[in-house]
């Protein structure tokens, strides 16, 4: 029985993995609730997922290093994301007042394209921030690289896109699932989704960072 629960057993590792994602998820949700610290929450989520995949474990010291080196850049990106989403929402409200079906279709297509591009950039910039220091002078370069990586590895990118779209779509189609889905995301689902995104992107990001270092 002692071997069954030993630190090197599969059961212990699985329970440790679940507990880590649970704690990280709760910490991130608290950060998102404060709004201004949302960028740090994303760093915590992506940093923890990266450590789990590369090292098999997450220590507070390692996670703190990941957060400390990029917290300011992450905060700026987060606030820019919020402003961008507010702009898209405002444009969507105006779109409802447009009478011409052609203009409405064209405008709606541009809004959807803008949202998709922003989402693709975010899906790759946060893993980059979690893995290395990004100076202010290189931020725009990293954003362009994130966009290029998202297009270059489109099938992997759409894993994150699917996870992002699936949750609101599920709630829209099944109103009775709202509280269950909300509880899942608040307790575990957010960290689990980030883990899947980081896992899908690990190989191309490893190759990209190795090519930069050489």
Predicted feature residues:
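Helix-coil boundary and N-terminal low-complexity module in membrane systems
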Residues: 1-111, 118-214
